[in-house]
Amino acid sequence: MERLRHLLADKVWHLLALLLPLPLLYPLIPAVFQQFSTRIPSGPTDNIAYVWVMHWLGKVLAQGADLFYDPSTYYPVGYPVTAIETTLANSLLFAPVTLLFGPVVAYNTAVIASFALTSYGMFLWVHAFTRRRLLALAAGLVGAFVPYHTAYLSGGQLPQITTQWIPLTLFALERYVRARRWGWMVLAGGLFGLNALSSWYNLVFLTLAAPAYFALRAGRPLLRRRAFWGHAMLGVVVAVALVLPAALPYLRANQRENRSWHARFVALYSVNPLHFFTPGIRHPVWGASVAQNWPTAQQQVRNYLRVVFAGYLTVLGAAVGLVLSRQRRLTRALGAVAAIGVISAMGPLLVDNNGTPVTVPVPQELTEQLNRAGLLNAVKDWLGPDFTEQLRSESRLVIPLPYALASWLPIFSSLRAVSRYSILMHLALTGLAALGADALIRRARQRWQAAGARVSALSAAAICVAACVALFEFWMLPVRTTELRRRPVDEWLANQPFGAVIELPLGKVIQRLSVYAQLEHRQPLALGLWGSFPPPVDGERRAVLERLPDADAVKEVCTWGVRYILINNYPGVSASTLERWHNALENMPAARKAGTFDTIEAYILDGC
């Protein structure tokens, strides 16, 4: 009976780690919880793309479609799905939800599950090295709501929201170090694969962080054991078996196309050291003041990728852990992971608050010597031709950072938003802060041994207060949401003869909304998902559409199989833009107005 009581008590802690994030998440996205099948977090941004991905995977499973080719967008050319992350760790795992309840419900379920599972992963990991359940629970909640996680919630990017596999992988490695059983290494390999299948960024993150963590955590005695290398190979085989089939189409796409980013462009998505100490501008108490008075916060208005605030209490706790914890191998391992996150998030070049590379003037003679030596030409493809020429003409040099060494490598060079590495810093600092709290509790118990019960009670209270303060530092106002439902015009299109659809005005928002609308009306689209690597046909077709009502442009549009053109009077679209497209269609003899459906006007191209 006593054993059963302990077992039930232990299960309660696991349930708390999984369930407590939900009431904390509710204030951030109340509309999503209330309208679960029709609303998704964030404005109409990349979130719609990943709702489409959830739908597409369901269609692949239900109808046997090609996972990496969609013939119904950019019709009749089709869309190479390798232009976007398929995030199989979400789209495949939640495919049953998609098939039963639709892609919006599946997307929302994946988002909410990421907070619950990140909390649970942190709970397991921290409990593995502290053996304190309340402390592990507090670390789990803090780890689930770090600024990186909530910032991407506001941005709607599902691959980056999916952070849970990182702490779960580190937990499996930690358990292997302690138990030295091959099963934990196999589990680590599987979880590593799920990281890659959630986001290719996560693959790169853990390719750097996991070996560093394990090598410093395990120490030489374990690394010298023959059995370890056999176990490690098992883990690698499992990871490769999961990742390689999904990665091959992307690797082939990288060979066909140049998907590398210039360092000057990557700098726009990098941060400088001050950003790690800059609170978020969406905090309910001091956010407005930070936005107005902190120069390092100005870019947060347009770029949530710069929200990398480490948290003052978390940093303080991590410093205590580094100094006081007796688990020196663990502190070194966590410190290394945090350092990888910080250094990599700063990108290949030192940047100012706006993401502009910091340059220093040098004598003209030095510039000429570097030019004669061919060094400027050597870095032209890396920095970008225009930026290199600017440096040459102004006789200035950039300040390279350690990540510049990695940014030359093939896969690393295709990573644009390097500030995403900050998730490693967040999770490692949370682990170090837990070690700091553990060290303080141990010291208190040693000093006041006679008052053990009182020390335990005070320690529990201190952990709860510290967790609340850390969460409050990271807190933000509710996230904007987007309603996705069948519009009257979609109902009309669903009952029309087959023909491709174009939705105007041109722009990312309208184009994304049209992608979801296609799931409702089922007609093909002449345009489609934008993505980080838009297919060449996207730019070509947009250029043709800009020439309407030119007769040659109309003929070109007809060759795409277009029969329906919509003008969406979406909030935020300027009156002059709407007038421009109205005039274009009214002056097209081939176009006939079919009707107005709420705020959307529909035209039929009879002349094609």
Predicted regions and their residues:
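Hydrophobic alpha-helical membrane-interfacial segments at the cytosolic entry of transmembrane helices
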Residues: 13-23, 190-191, 223-248, 263-268, ...
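Membrane-lumen/periplasm interface segments of specific transmembrane helices
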Residues: 199, 233-265, 273-274, 279-289
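Membrane-interface coil-to-helix junctions
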Residues: 21-118, 146-151, 157-163, 270, ...
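Signature aromatic-anchored transmembrane alpha helix within multi-pass, membrane-resident enzymes
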Residues: 211, 232-240, 339, 431, ...
